[in-house]
Amino acid sequence: MSLNKNQFLDNFQNILSAQFTGTQNWWTKSLFHFTDIKNAISIIENGKIYSRNKVIELNLMQNDNANDSVILNTNNEYKNYVRLYFGPSTPTQKNNEGIKPKDKIFQNAHCPIPIMFVFDFKKIFLLQNIRFTDGN
């Protein structure tokens, strides 16, 4: 029996939900994008979250949150998409967030004041032209 997209998403959410318990369970109904407050202001002003390549092209990035080696090792095609996460707390976020002295910033990865954007899981996954990766 083949599943339509809605059925597939319901099954996928149930699988995710089984991995999160208690107060974390609501995460499975959302997708997350974090960035520094300076970039968040630009996102709100423009009403859009652009891909890494597009934000560089439009000169909109106020603060580059990313680790240089992660970006260097990310396929350029993936930089044409907005990076969203299944949970609001990722190793990347934990390593990069917070106001830090320069000697504590590793490979330019710094997100002094993180802002989290939260999106409806199903609405995003029902959009055309979305992609999944299992990492960077």
Task: Briefly describe each language-model feature range.
Residues 2-136:
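Active-site-proximal loop/hinge segments that shape catalytic or ion-binding/gating pockets
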